[in-house]
Amino acid sequence: MNTNKKILILTANYGNGHMQVAKTLYDECKSQGFEHVVVSNLYQESNPIVSEVTQYLYLKSFSIGKQFYRLFYYGVDKIYNKRKFNIYLKMGNKRLDELIQLHNPDIIIITFPMIVVPEYRNKTGKIIPTFNVMTDFCLHKIWVHENIDRYYVATDYVKQKLVEIGTHPSDVKVTGIPIRPQFEADVPKSKIYKKYGLSSNKKVLLIMAGAHGVLKNVKELCEALLLDSEVQIVVVCGKNAALKQSLSDLEQTHPDQLKALGYVEQIDELFRVTDCMITKPGGITLTEATALGVPVILYKPVPGQEKENAHFFEDYGAAIVINRHEDILESVTNLLQDEEKLESMKQNMKSLHLKHSSQTILEDIVEQSDLITNNKTYARALS
């Protein structure tokens, strides 16, 4: 593999997934010996104020703006024509030009849909091999452009959707979504149980409550579940200090059953020992769950890519989708008591995972970029 190539990775922080994939690909580049690798949060660098406002609105869509986001997501996908979205087409254009002039990349990798990047080829005539690494288990047309040289997708389902709208099958490679390598490492569980004060003889429910819009009334749900002495609950509150504080009294009265945690760096450890997890259907979290075979319960997915992700996993028999708060307790209780269902969901989850995605993607990108560059040189020689 030619590690002398200069790589520019472009991303955006609308949710953590796109940035995390960019970071994983960056780490893979460095581990393979690439010296010239740059990651750019393009929209943030291009217009910080607009970026902050739109990120705020994006987060609010999980609570008060669901219908607006639904109309935007499905409406744009239905009528999408890049020429009609002239403002979006130009977003980040100046900063992109600066980055290209500064770094002169041989390869551009995109982990967030950015029309401005493939449009740069039309605008300047400069051919820089450009690749989309898609971060969900569904397709939105805003990812698609004739100047994207190859798409890297999670599943055959996403590939088929791309082919149906005119993408050549050879321009799509099913690789899975890049995740942090610790999720694919072999780690003994015994030390993890001890570290978090959990028993290996009782069921463990993991609630990822720190993410936006996952679950309300977490305390009430925990109170009800704690009536079963055979259930252990781990609530990851992330940066939600108020939630962690609200669970402190309950944690003190049930120290062996309830663990309320803040931000957890080695979250893969908890994935390894949990029997099922309540979370939101983000593409990265779901991919991490496939790596370790964690059955998931998805509560009221937000319309858009998360709802489409949820439908895919539900149809595949790897997730349970709950749309009413009053159904959560019964669904969780029934699942934890159903060994056959848990095992089936676990195996279905594992069957969706493709190992070493970042390595596969990087190797293929370098190979494809060589072909594109050689073809470009050949065409120039003929002219």
Curated annotation (Swiss-Prot):
One GO molecular-function entry: 1,2-diacylglycerol 3-glucosyltransferase activity
NCBIfam families per UniProt: PRK13609.1 (NF010135)
Which family would the database say this protein is a member of?
Belongs to the glycosyltransferase 28 family. UgtP subfamily.
Q: Which Pfam families match?
A: Glycos_transf_1, MGDG_synth
Keywords attached to this entry: Carbohydrate metabolism, Cell membrane, Glycosyltransferase, Lipid biosynthesis, Lipid metabolism, Membrane, Transferase
Record localization: Cell membrane
- Cellular component terms, GO, for this chain's entry? plasma membrane
Pathway listed for it?
Glycolipid metabolism; diglucosyl-diacylglycerol biosynthesis
Q: Give the GO terms filed under biological process for this record.
A: enterobacterial common antigen biosynthetic process; glycolipid biosynthetic process; lipoteichoic acid biosynthetic process
Gene name as annotated: ugtP
Q: Which InterPro entries match?
A: Diacylglyc_glucosyltr_N (IPR009695), Glyco_trans_1 (IPR001296), Glycosyltransf_28_UgtP (IPR050519), Pro_diacylglycrl_glcsylTrfase (IPR023589)
* Organism of derivation: Bacillus pumilus (strain SAFR-032)
Q: Could you identify this protein by its name?
A: Processive diacylglycerol beta-glucosyltransferase
**What is this protein's function?**
Processive glucosyltransferase involved in the biosynthesis of both the bilayer- and non-bilayer-forming membrane glucolipids. Is able to successively transfer up to three glucosyl residues to diacylglycerol (DAG), thereby catalyzing the formation of beta-monoglucosyl-DAG (3-O-(beta-D-glucopyranosyl)-1,2-diacyl-sn-glycerol), beta-diglucosyl-DAG (3-O-(beta-D-glucopyranosyl-beta-(1->6)-D-glucopyranosyl)-1,2-diacyl-sn-glycerol) and beta-triglucosyl-DAG (3-O-(beta-D-glucopyranosyl-beta-(1->6)-D-glucopyranosyl-beta-(1->6)-D-glucopyranosyl)-1,2-diacyl-sn-glycerol).
Reactions catalysed: a 1,2-diacyl-3-O-(beta-D-glucopyranosyl)-sn-glycerol + UDP-alpha-D-glucose = a 1,2-diacyl-3-O-(beta-D-Glc-(1->6)-beta-D-Glc)-sn-glycerol + UDP + H(+); a 1,2-diacyl-3-O-(beta-D-Glc-(1->6)-beta-D-Glc)-sn-glycerol + UDP-alpha-D-glucose = a 1,2-diacyl-3-O-(beta-D-Glc-(1->6)-beta-D-Glc-(1->6)-beta-D-Glc)-sn-glycerol + UDP + H(+); a 1,2-diacyl-sn-glycerol + UDP-alpha-D-glucose = a 1,2-diacyl-3-O-(beta-D-glucopyranosyl)-sn-glycerol + UDP + H(+)
Q: Does the UniProt entry include the keyword Cytoplasm?
A: no
